[in-house]
Amino acid sequence: MVKVLVVAFGGQYNHLIKRSIERIGHEAALRPYNLPPPDEGEFDCVVFGGGPLTMPKDFDKVKGLEAYLRWKKPLLGICLGHQVLALLNGGEVGPSPKPEYGDVTIFVDDEDDILRGLAPSFRAWESHNEEVLREPPNSKVIAHSENTRVQALKYYNGPYYGVQFHPEVQHTEKGSLVFQNFVELCKR
């Protein structure tokens, strides 16, 4: 059984992330983002969840999360967590030219580990005013939507992934598959 730490930014969906992981047979724990990281040996991997912070305006509040990158364990950023991960790696985040809310079609550009089984496209739930405008130099865009060029990122400096959409909500087609794929990475 894999133990996943869900770093919570106060968003309404963090409990759904925890339950999504538990529903596929693994253990998950929530931890507020403003607490220091626990002992690295307690968890196999980390999820940065969503929340109401605004990037990059609130970036100073989350800079300490770079400590999780030093763990070199699989890390999945979701929505705000995706944006935080991009900023920690030198990307650019800002206001979305066309914010997305509700049901959106995601186009898979590279059916990499985290998006395995989701190509060529799938429907996902979106709720964002900000987005990754420029991906970090150590990453690759692996999915996009009509209005958001960076829907998913794969990083090359560690086993890290970010998704702008919400795999934890029932409106996302095959959302549990994203978590299953992530847990498989955690087992490696």
Swiss-Prot record:
EC numbers, comma separated: 6.3.5.2
Superkingdom field: Archaea
Catalytic center residues: 79 (nucleophile), 166, 168
Catalysed reactions, as listed in the record: XMP + L-glutamine + ATP + H2O = GMP + L-glutamate + AMP + diphosphate + 2 H(+)
InterPro entries: Class_I_gatase-like, GATASE, GMP_synthase_A
Listed pathway(s): Purine metabolism; GMP biosynthesis; GMP from XMP (L-Gln route): step 1/1
Gene3D superfamilies the record matches: 3.40.50.880
Keywords: ATP-binding, Glutamine amidotransferase, GMP biosynthesis, Ligase, Nucleotide-binding, Purine biosynthesis
SUPFAM superfamilies reported for this sequence: Class I glutamine amidotransferase-like (SSF52317)
Gene Ontology molecular function: any one: GMP synthase activity
Keyword Nucleotide-binding among UniProt keywords: yes
Pfam families on file: GATase
Described function: Catalyzes the synthesis of GMP from XMP.
Quaternary structure annotation from Swiss-Prot or TrEMBL: Heterodimer composed of a glutamine amidotransferase subunit (A) and a GMP-binding subunit (B).
NCBIfam families: PRK00758.1 (NF001975)
Protein name: GMP synthase [glutamine-hydrolyzing] subunit A
Species of provenance: Ignicoccus hospitalis (strain KIN4/I / DSM 18386 / JCM 14125)
